[in-house]
Amino acid sequence: MKRVLTTTMAVALGAALSSPAFATNGYFTHGVGTASKAMAGTGIGSNADMGAIMAASNPALAVFTGDQWEVGLAVFSPMRSYKASTSQLNGGLIPIDPANNVFLPSLTITPGGVDSSSELFPIPYVAKSWSLQNKAKLSFAFYGRGGMNTDWDSSNASATSYFCGGDPLVGDPPATGPGPFCAGDAGVDLSQAFLAVNYSAKIGDNFAWGAGPIFAVQLFKAKGIGTFAPITESFAASGGTALPTSLTNNSHDSSTGFGFGAGLWWGITDTVSAGLAYQSTISMNEFGDYADLFAEQGDFDIPSSLKGGLSFLASDALRVNLDVEYTAYSDVDSVGNPMANMLTCPTLPFGGTSLSNCLGGDNGAGFGWDDMTTYKLGFEWQRDENNTWRFGYSYGKQPIQAADVLFNILAPGVMEQHITFGLTRQTTNGGAWSFSFMYAPEKTVTGPNMFDTTQTIELKMKQLEFEVGYSF
């Protein structure tokens, strides 16, 4: 058993960290586990057996599972693009104080639409639960839930700016360079994997609790954003003499950290139950190779989340789940700080004096994401003793502000709606196959280019996902 566990974990870890994806509620998936995903991520308050992986969503729910293994694999397809409008500046100078010859180079993205490549990603999970004395359970769940990936090919994307080349003092026009930031192929690659180990127990027949530590590991790489080198803290601190070495085009960097999760379940009546689950902020080591990009010298913690749910047995065959999930993206500075913070970096001509507002500084720019609240509705219909059908819908206002669309070309987390369905079929040997499908309708966010306010940028994405799981 120890060898099986070690081998399974190693395979899952390698798959999770080699499979970046841009997830669906911000940069988190719409749920964890095949059965829950088929109901739009609901089930926090349900005592139905949805597999050992449900302990990752609410640790208390492990008491309702058998002693079982569960493995699953999703194939996730995010189809993302951006579209830039025409510009009146076309990379020219923005007058700040013309009387004193103070100008800011604009950055104009070449008008037109560009699609990101890399549209298929595998996302695995594995979970196990064991019975202990006094109706208690020990469980572990290893899963990928967070991540983002964009890949903008320089062969069909470009930008024009004096940041790219040319000297206005001698009458040169601004240069046009490849990539959306005129620094070659651009994009980010973030993978996050989680290991949750939980102890859960019942108190009487109508109450259960669970808690345990969460270990996380993440990998990150960025490319094609060297245009922002003059706005980094290290460049400003050097007096403009030393370009940053931890901003872009380095290899994948890794980061690890710990947090905790806890959950409750309450059987209110024979047909109504409720659940509550909390995951703390997971404090991660800094990405040293990207200390000039992320606020607080490369810090990229994983935000906390709070989930609550009600579950109703409408009949012997039909269960209805109502869930809500709150994710505190703004608590993580590298995610929540607005892009406008960089405008007060001393290297830009706006009179800023604080190095901490430059990229990589303690108050450096992030992606400007708001916190996100997602409302979910799920249905579980047991057609017969061997087949259970599931359906779901969720809505959450996307976290990106219009003013921050330029940076969010790298991380266009704009999805709001998810439509899901799935099936669990029992097998003759005591196992069960589960399937889920998710469709996220196309959503766009449009806002001004912060370095060329005569231009607008439209971020667009839609998504598909198919997942299969097996418990035994």
State where each predicted segment sits.
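N-terminal, post-signal peptide beta-strand-biased segments of exported outer-membrane/organellar beta-barrel
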Residues: 19-144, 410-415
